[in-house]
Amino acid sequence: MTIAAFVHLCIDRLSPLYPEAEAKAMAFRLLEHFCDIPSYKYVSEPDMPLASATDSRHFQLDSDRHSLPLVAALASLGSRLDRESETLAALEELSTGRPLQYVLGFTEFCGHRFKVGEGCLIPRPETEELVSRIIDDLYADDDSAVPGSTSSVVPGSTGHLEADDDSPFSILDLCTGSGCIAWSLAAEFPEAMVYGCDLSDAALRYACRQRIKLRGAKPIFFSADVLAAPPAGLPKFDVIVSNPPYICNSERAAMRPNVLDFEPAEALFVPDDDPLRFYRAIARWADVLLRPDGHLYLEINERFGSDVAALFPGSRVVADITGRDRFVIR
């Protein structure tokens, strides 16, 4: 199959689910990931077969004999055909509605590659913007980072999380999911102690398995229900950040099947009659764990900006780059 034929096949197979431009972009992602084919090849070499474009490193001529051994050539051919099959299989998965990030097994967030899959919410651009705001604010504060260190723990263990008021600059990510916020902040501030918690064991497994290059220590991840009281033994925090569930159940009708059928509902939705339940719980955690001069960063449903801000005296509602009320910051 040629590059052009594969792109056209993607557009055709994915047309019931995605607009043409989005389906085409997905085709390019599959070609790049599985076949090492950059998107510009669609224009410059549209008739190139996928198999011949794949694994080109195997086709370097032997420097001494100027020939490729038959066994190596056959192995390379098999590898290339396997990759073409993998690419077509990935397209089949996409055609069922499975998210591209789950098919690839990762997503990009704040310049890092995060593992994602079933049971783990896919990070969104709005959350990247939230992290960027935290980073900008902390860099603006000369006292934002002081020495500290941590070690990672497995889900379900909270007993040894002990620190006193003299602990280093600390950040807590509530409803951490994939751990994208916690890891991104740990990468940016190597001297800070970063914690992340979630109730979902599946999400915590992903959070603990991330392999983000750090100059400091790994975040500490622990199991906790944000709707319950904070576990004993946690330190005071200088920053609490959260992207909790905030989409009302009644908003499901406006969402795509690739979200509704695959991503964890418990990480997305709240009851229509209690849309602020997680924010009230976060307020209780902040009352106990946030230092008096600490900062709070929350991602919110644009419909409830003023309602969320009212739970956190001194906070303000901040719009995202699209102009929608998306954050409450204090």
Features from the language model and the residues they span:
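SAM-dependent Rossmann-like transferase core, predominantly class I methyltransferases
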Residues: A89-P147, G156-R209, P230, G323, ...
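Generic alpha-helical structural context detector
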Residues: F28-E32, E92, S132, S151, ...
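Conserved AdoMet
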Residues: L31-D137
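S-adenosylmethionine
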Residues: E188-M193, C197-I329
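Non-catalytic nucleic-acid substrate-recognition regions in nucleic-acid-modifying enzymes
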Residues: M1-M26
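Ser/Thr/Pro-rich low-complexity tandem-repeat tracts
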Residues: F59, S67, S76-S79, S144, ...
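A general structural signal for well-ordered alpha-helical segments in protein cores
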Residues: V7, A27, T87, G97-L100, ...
